[in-house]
């Protein structure tokens, strides 16, 4: 990955959202790097047959990272060896930012920010045992308090190709007023490797503001992309205009990919995606109530065609989508 000639755009891993069907849709709008939903090392080692599907990728994904979590060195090593057999995976990203209690309270995700020596040791374990060309890490600014300097200095000793920094602590969760781009800039000044800024990037204007403040080598976007996958196209072209895409066709394409990938259960799974796509549209609440009752492919498709019977969004700027606690 050459960070010298352009600012790279990443789709953030979001549990329950950034599966293969969604990544396939987003990839068409110019995102450079896609990442799997977070997969625990334990699941990879002890339930690989069930977990493997989360690590499949579409032919469009030319830079695809498998994101794993874990805190036990031996289990992480075995998980990496499992991924080694997956030739389509281009690299491994290590999650040290997930704030969910069931993850962090067991020393995984953002819980590793309380023991930076162990965090670096795990990153070395990944690098020493992987056959992939790229390894990376995603962190927050700290667990309860901000320690950006300490994290940056520690990661200078870690064998990773780039660092993704979410501009909040674990305690901040997703509070909008807690975002701190200056601390990302501080880490950028210390780290001797590329830094990717993440958090609250919801428009073209915000994207360039964050790049200016942080001097980051790229941006990672999650929630804003759920409703407006084209935000990557807008940033790449520095425009607030929308690409030539009919929203109804995009939603239908995403739905068809869900059914193809998951079978009939893809209908129910797609409800949350429809909630995101409908946010900000007229009658969105009634539409959400309606789709929450639909279980058949035919009726869901008809509902989508009826509701999204308009060529474009009513608003240019993506609205936030609330995520569940599992989301990273």
Predicted feature descriptions by range:
Residues 1-328:
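Flavin-dependent oxidoreductase catalytic cores
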């Amino acid at each position: 990955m050459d960070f010298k000639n352009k600012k790279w755009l990443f789709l953030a891993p979001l549990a329950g959202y950034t599966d293969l069907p969604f990544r396939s849709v987003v990839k068409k709008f110019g995102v450079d790097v896609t990442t799997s939903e977070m997969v625990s090392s334990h699941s990879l080692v002890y339930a690989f047959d069930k977990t493997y599907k989360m690590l499949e990728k579409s032919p469009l994904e030319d830079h695809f990272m498998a994101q794993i979590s874990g805190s036990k060195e031996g289990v992480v090593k075995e998980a990496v060896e499992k991924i080694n057999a997956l030739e389509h995976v281009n690299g491994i990203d290590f999650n040290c930012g997930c704030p969910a209690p069931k993850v962090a309270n067991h020393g995984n995700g953002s819980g590793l920010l309380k023991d930076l020596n162990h965090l670096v040791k795990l990153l070395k374990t990944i690098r020493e045992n992987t056959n992939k060309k790229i390894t990376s890490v995603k962190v927050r600014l700290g667990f309860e308090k901000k320690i950006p300097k300490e994290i940056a200095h520690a990661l200078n000793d870690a064998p990773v190709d780039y660092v993704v920094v979410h501009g909040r602590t674990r305690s901040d969760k997703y509070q909008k007023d807690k975002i701190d781009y200056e601390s990302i800039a501080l880490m950028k000044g210390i780290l001797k490797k590329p830094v990717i800024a993440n958090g609250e990037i919801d428009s073209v204007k915000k994207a360039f503001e964050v790049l200016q403040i942080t001097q980051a080598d790229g941006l990672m976007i999650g929630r804003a992309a759920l409703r407006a996958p084209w935000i990557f196209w807008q940033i790449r072209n520095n425009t607030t205009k929308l690409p030539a895409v009919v929203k109804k066709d995009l939603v239908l394409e995403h739905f068809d990919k869900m059914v193809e990938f998951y079978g009939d259960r893809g209908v129910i799974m797609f409800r949350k995606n429809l909630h995101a796509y409908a946010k900000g549209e007229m009658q969105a609440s009634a539409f959400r109530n309606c789709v929450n009752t639909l279980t058949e492919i035919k009726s869901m498709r008809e509902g989508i065609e009826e509701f999204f019977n308009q060529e474009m969004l009513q608003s240019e700027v993506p609205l936030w989508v609330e995520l569940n606690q599992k989301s990273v």
